[in-house]
Amino acid sequence: MNTQQLAKLRSIVPEMRRVRHIHFVGIGGAGMGGIAEVLANEGYQISGSDLAPNPVTQQLASLGATIFFNHRPENVRDASVVVVSSAISADNPEIVAAHEARIPVIRRAEMLAELMRFRHGIAIAGTHGKTTTTAMVSSIYAEAGLDPTFVNGGLVKAAGVHARLGHSRYLIAEADESDASFLHLQPMVAIVTNIEADHMDTYQGDFENLKQTFINFLHNLPFYGRAVMCVDDPVIRELLPRVGRQTTTYGFSDDADVRVEEYQQVGPQGHFTLLRQDKPAMQVTLNAPGRHNALNAAAAVAVATEEGIDDEAILRALESFQGTGRRFDFLGEFPLEPVNGKAGTAMLVDDYGHHPTEVDATIKAARAGWPDKNLVMVFQPHRFTRTRDLYDDFANVLTQVDALLMLDVYAAGEAPIPGADSRSLCRTIRGRGKIDPILVSDPAQVAQMLAPVLTGNDLILVQGAGNIGKIARTLAEIKLKPQTQEEEQHG
């Protein structure tokens, strides 16, 4: 970026010129890293800390950011402001040091709000589908030549990054309700995909509190802004009279303003018709599987149509959509050792979904696209509180696969909760008599324990939000073949 471009960007918020060095605590998180990437490209000095390297920290280092793989007071030296993720506790040494040095400490969403303040902000909120919908909106705007800035919670595969600095007035961002910090945002357009009980510790266990927080978020829209909401969701339908802003609805429902009809899935693609008020019907080919992704696309089309984007650009973007990292992410199809004398293959798919509704949508997409496959899931529950609160829902959803391997709960810093562990969940599922789940206590043994349940015509879903994505990549690297101890040592 040249000096003139940088000066123009910094003039958006003149007071931000006083800020030179921005430090991120928990910089390896996708949402944090995305904002850091945009700011690095705007010319700010970026530093950050996390516990281990990952693709996000590697990308930031390539842009000149200083990354510390520890949390020490000296890491915040000379910082103008410290940005923290919701996963960081208040007693973190860097946060304590920043307070002592009277350095401002702000949450991620506050910095995102500053980026959005004088841009045309499009914020995508909801319990499920935020990341993919953000990527779809970004892809359509890019295809239309509008050069948007985007900040996403997952890797946008077409761009190879979580975030990108554009040179237009548009900023498209995923809005995080997990800590209610999306209330800092003041977008021009807001999408709400759905509302379900999740992150309930933030909302004192009160679902009414969660619903009111979404209403408060929508009230951050100016009176001339627009809410785009999925009317298929019963909670959203209930809340519509309280929105108080111009609203476009979408869904499979007959009364949706943007309506999905005639949905069919063929392999990884969805084919459907979109009906819009006072507009020609669109015949859509979407390069993403599942009815849930048709809904995500309908939301993106609703926003793009309101902006006046050409239908041909919309259709091109959806047909060529490359998806996001760890969202029904196809890692390969691998040959297997002959089973009963017959050679076969197994497809490997990595998916981030960790709420029962998300897991259910992934299973349905797999069944619809590959109905003859033996569906095997490797599942890692995420957080003891979520496992406890949604225990029966998990048990019901996970019985839909043909074979299930379950890893221990990924704690994400939580203390264990009796009865909300993987062993208990396996026992409950087994008691329902549909499948016999296998508990895998050692992640290194996944490939070995997979082998006996494969038939030679398999689709393996590696599912969860913890560190299970690394297991998926390892399975792809070894091509699903169990390794000997010697191979593991030399791998």
From Swiss-Prot:
UniProt name for this protein: UDP-N-acetylmuramate--L-alanine ligase
Any Gene Ontology CC annotation: cytoplasm
Positions that bind ATP: 126-132
Keywords: ATP-binding, Cell cycle, Cell division, Cell shape, Cell wall biogenesis/degradation, Cytoplasm, Ligase, Nucleotide-binding, Peptidoglycan synthesis
Keyword Ribonucleoprotein: no
Organism: Citrobacter koseri (strain ATCC BAA-895 / CDC 4225-83 / SGSC4696)
EC number(s) from the headed UniProt entry: 6.3.2.8
Protein family: Belongs to the MurCDEF family.
Broad class of enzyme this protein falls into: ligase
Subcellular location: Cytoplasm
